Amino acid sequence: CGARERAGCLTAGPVKARLLAVGERAPAWVAQGFAEYQKRLSHWLPLELIEIEPGVRGKGRDAACATADEGARVLAALPKSVQIVALDGRGRMHSSEQLAQRLEHWRGGGRDLAFLIGGPEGHAPEVLARADESWSLGPLTLPHMLVRLVLAEQLYRAAALLANHPYHRA
């Protein structure tokens, strides 16, 4: 779509997104915020949350083993033939406008999307190796539960940009 046609560019289409997040059930305020953006996105980019059980940590248990367990569960839960984006502090940063461009590109490709949030120690090396892209939300350290909400909001913002919706005001 060109700039003139962009208003109709992001109608409901075959592309869906999944957020695979390692961790326990989110606190009510995170779940409520995520659900709000999930609802807003539903007609542009349906977004499904898949919670992945965290690895066992604690006395006598190596964190690397827990991360490896989480990685195996994430990889097992991934649908086939999806565009995989791992959220990682060492990944590439995007502006909201750049994210909108990526979303437009993905929709043109027709593949579903999978966004991955790792556990406390991040992603297992096997997960990062399988990812098509690695993103960082910025140099700040964010609680993993908050990342769910921030990602959902940024996906909504990108979709709103593509649809010429007034939500995004730079």
Task: Pin down the residues of each PLM region.
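Short glycine-rich anion-binding loops that position phosphate/pyrophosphate groups of nucleotides
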Residues: 25, 89-92, 119-122
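A mid-sequence interfacial segment
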Residues: 101-138
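N-terminal beta1-alpha1 ligand-phosphate binding loop
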Residues: 12-41
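Short, surface-exposed alpha-helical segments at coil->helix boundaries
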Residues: 31, 35-38, 68-72, 125
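Short hydrophobic segments within beta-strands
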Residues: 20-22, 50, 116
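S-adenosyl-L-methionine/SAH cofactor-binding core of RNA-modifying enzymes
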Residues: 46-114
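Structured adenosyl-cofactor binding patch, chiefly the S-adenosyl-L-methionine
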Residues: 125-169
